Amino acid sequence: MVDVNRFKSMQITLASPTKVRSWSYGEVKKPETINYRTLKPEREGLFDEVIFGPTKDWECACGKYKRIRYKGIVCDRCGVEVTRAKVRRERMGHIELKAPVSHIWYFKGIPSRMGLTLDMSPRALEEVIYFAAYVVIDPKETPLEPKSLLTEREYREKLQEYGHGSFVAKMGAEAIQDLLKQVDLEAEIAELKEELKTATGQKRFKAVRRLDVLDAFYKSGNKPEWMVLNILPVLPPDLRPMVQLDGGRFAASDLNDLYRRVINRNNRLARLLELGAPGIIVQNEKRMLQEAVDALIDNGRRGRPITGPGSRPLKSLSHMLKGKQGRFRQNLLGKRVDFSGRSVIAVGPTLKMYQCGVPRLMAIELFKPFVMREIVAREYAGNVKAAKRMVERGDERIWDILEDVIKEHPVLLNRAPTLHRLGIQAFEPVLIDGKALRLHPLVCEAYNADFDGDQMAIHVPLSEEAQAEARLLLLAAEHILNPKDGKPVVTPSQDMVLGNYYLTMEDEGREGEGMIFKDIDEAVMAYHNGYVHLHSRVGIAVDSMPDKPWKENQLHKILVTTVGKILFNSIIPSEIPYLQETTNENLTDSTPDKYFLEPGQDIQTVIDSLEINAPFKKKHLGNIIAEIFKRLRTTETSAFLDRLKDLGYYYSTLAGLTVGIADIPVIDNKQEIIDAAHHRVEEINKAFRRGLMTEDDRYVAVTTTWREAKDALEKRLIETQDPKNPIVMMMDSGARGNISNFSQLAGMRGLMAAPNGRIMELPILSNFREGLSVLEMFFSTHGARKGMTDTALKTADSGYLTRRLVDVAQDVIIREDDCGTDRGLVIRAITDGKEVTETLEERLFGRYTKKSVKHPETGEVIVGPDTLITEDMAAAIVNAGVEEVTIRSVFTCKTRHGVCRHCYGINLATGDAVEVGEAVGTIAAQSIGEPGTQLTMRTFHTGGVASNTDITQGLPRIQEIFEARNPKGEAVITEVKGTVIEIEEDAATRTKKVFVQGKTGMGEYVVPFTARMKVEVGDEVHRGEALTEGSIQPKRLLEVRDTLSVETYLLAEVQKVYRSQGVEIGDKHVEVMVRQMLRKVRVMDPGDTDLLPGTLMDISDFTDANKDIVISGGVPATSRPVLLGITKASLETNSFLSAASFQETTRVLTDAAIRGKKDHLIGLKENVIIGKIIPAGTGMARYRNIEPLAVNEVEVIENIAVDEAIVESSED
């Protein structure tokens, strides 16, 4: 058996007839499949056991030889070799075709490879192949042109004219094969290269395309005539099975029908040739054979597809590979796995962060082999069969064994759709009753799970290695941070937030206010016995909490706080200051001094002088988690999270918050506000009727009036709300709902959008407490429906975007420590107009500097060169007033097929520097794709007359950027660096002209009349700067500026879209994706290299090709950078396996076969396809080639190290 993990590379070429014969175990001569009576395969048929091997293991067809001991013997009666039945999946047969047949992939693909090789048009080829015309193969002495076409009539006339045998002309694939055999590749290539030196325009384009194909044949060693088949391979029978159904009927693969047609026509052709039938009949039969083979290879590519019962097109060999149901995506990239189950999930509030509840019945089934092994080991049963019976009977003793087996054996839980890597995490199983899986409430956010009927799948890692990885890398307690932005992803929500909010509230004049306690226990006892309320402000001796980081001047004093806050602080690690207020200073520095009592001071006076502090909201809890993680890392954080969860649930239960209709307040002056708005609208309409304003102005004024009315009601609501109102508490704490929900309950619902997206002028005046009228209800349904459809469409769009992103970046892996590049990227804050979309501080954190950063005033070095910037350093840089910093960036990294550690920086998911082997491309793709569903689908109209273009935003804009399409609402850019000297308006053509004066000359740009200008007369502009509002076309920018400018522009654009929707994504993820779009260059002039002009190639391959030429003193090739959209970039990847499994499978494989492409299995996808361990993480060569050391060797190495250290110190 071939060991997949030893594979170096995989090559695909055209198969020569000898190759096909060498694969084959015999010729299939009859169209029969199996005998209808005996159900045994027919001899020489499509399922023949002589050719393809036995149907039963170690048993010949007639039954003379049975058992493994006859292995390898060929039966003398039936001729079947005694071997495993599995060989029926690998042994091929063949069909000897009685006439050559063209391969439809090479004749029909775009561009037609046959056509380019012969320099004939695809239409001419079609006429010849399908017997509609003759082609002149050898004109001999006649004046006929070689390769010219003759109709049947012309052919006969020419024969009469020049005499029989005076020239050779044929029809059918046979003629094409003869022509292909005549092609002299070397001579043709030399001729084309000469032609290229002078050719221009269309002629040059065609020559380049022909040269490309001929060169591919020449370099790969494929012969052009192999594009025509004389012998057809037959797929192994178990890959096109025939199975008996219950009713005695048979279900067979479509391929069998297609093969049957080929065999029937081939046999008929053989008979006709034997009988010497008239030419026209033979011709017709040959054409039918050609069509049968076409249908077998790619049914439906030419003409109407061959259909089966119910006029359903039959699935041909090509269809077996294509699409989501094809071989690649269905069976190779995603397989169904054993040792897995799925069930509904329920909440497990008592679980620890690293645990999940698994139903007993499920666990016994999943861990069956482990339990059976243990039963035999404990001698409850003599052998495995007996042990299996024990488990299936449900013997009492198996449950104790199960408990022992699952200890320390993590399982993986996955929820579909798995949008990012947090969609699969490992947990330790805890056995529970019932049939639902129990999930820890804090991991719900990562899975995007809720308990309204969601289901999850469970998988068991089997090998020791898999268990170790699950435990060390995938355990849920390790995944505190989100890989997309490095912020905690496990923040408490809903009840947990509410409980902690309630617990940390403060209130005036509640029972027990001003009491002083000696320690925590006394305070808690007083609370339990009803002497003091949770929210009462009381005093407690600082010295009773010795492990907190108090300042010197705070010791031996009394702290003013509440019992709730004492309880809340008791779960917080002792390294964090006592949290008395929600400020950042309190969290990072120390508890403010104003809460401490000097000896002899009256506590009541201090309490009265203090403001009432806001309770801890969801945002503050998130900050606390982040701070604890920063200081104490994973283990302590996950333990703290569990304590926070328990506390939250406990106190939200105790608080007993309920919502009734009386809790929705009534706004006293609602009617006045609405009447005023009505009055204003009436005035606007009057003004419109008098002709004082346009229809557009009136519409804008009316909608604005109603918006203002709604805002006024909302403002009034906020002013009058009672902080103890349960709805307000839920909203304020961030547990559920927001001000907009609240104002719909108590204010007014406001304006609604009509089905066409335009906002209707009639607002909904009622709120949900009062109830809506029938008409209002009807209006509001439009929006609801649109919301649902948008979400459904968006999910599909976003999923497809993620798939394309993953595909283009899947081979980007951290390959080395430092690439040693001499380039860096200058970064500053990203701004959109006046507002900052991403601050410099956010952009600096977790990157390596390229040059040292100096203080702009004092000149002192804040951060040295090639240093990892921490949060504190980033803050120091920004505080010093530095506006731009040169950092190491993915854009400028020199590593081939990946990135180096220094150019990438910190791994956002762990907060530490990234490790070699991290699959950063996939992480980047997931980080950009996962929030895709949160982006909007709409194209905004910029209101009325301001501009005539719509600005695309949300998901469509992201797709536009990554596919490098020409944007809607394109901005005009300048190609000259200089000053804007005049902007003249031309009313006649309805355009403006902008004149830019530069050092090298004057630039004149025509701008639409309605476009909004971004520049004024006298402004300085740089090359590639936008003169008008709108999006710059990146391909145009690439022509005017360099690659780095385009990369920086695309990065800023992507960030603008995501940030405007409140989604944060680390720069480095976008950098990884954008770099993949600019990996290729197009060769302009090959110089002395053997590159072809017009070829697309990887930058690193281009540099390599030039390196040798430059060293030997030749003329290097020149090239131009190319910007590819992600779909195009995925298809242009060097790995044909990866490209074929993405899209356009047949096109990719046709091209790869002609070029004889080798796939070096560098990316992740190609390794998954062939089943090899992926070259990322622990699958990287440097982690796999580790030799275990014997104990004594370790000692020797340690001694050597000690000796070396002694030597070094003595040299000093």
UniProtKB/Swiss-Prot annotation:
Positions annotated to bind Zn(2+) 1: 60, 62, 75, 78
Binding-site list for Zn(2+) 2: 819, 893, 900, 903
Positions of Mg(2+) binding: 450, 452, 454
SUPFAM superfamilies: beta and beta-prime subunits of DNA dependent RNA-polymerase
GO cellular component: DNA-directed RNA polymerase complex
CDD domains for this protein: RNAP_beta'_C, RNAP_beta'_N
Keywords tagged on the record: DNA-directed RNA polymerase, Magnesium, Metal-binding, Nucleotidyltransferase, Transcription, Transferase, Zinc
Annotated EC: 2.7.7.6
GO terms under biological process: DNA-templated transcription
Cofactor: Mg(2+); Zn(2+)
Reaction it catalyzes: RNA(n) + a ribonucleoside 5'-triphosphate = RNA(n+1) + diphosphate
Function: DNA-dependent RNA polymerase catalyzes the transcription of DNA into RNA using the four ribonucleoside triphosphates as substrates.
UniProt-recorded name of the protein: DNA-directed RNA polymerase subunit beta'
Organism of provenance: Streptococcus thermophilus (strain ATCC BAA-491 / LMD-9)
Classification of source organism: Bacteria, Bacillati, Bacillota, Bacilli, Lactobacillales
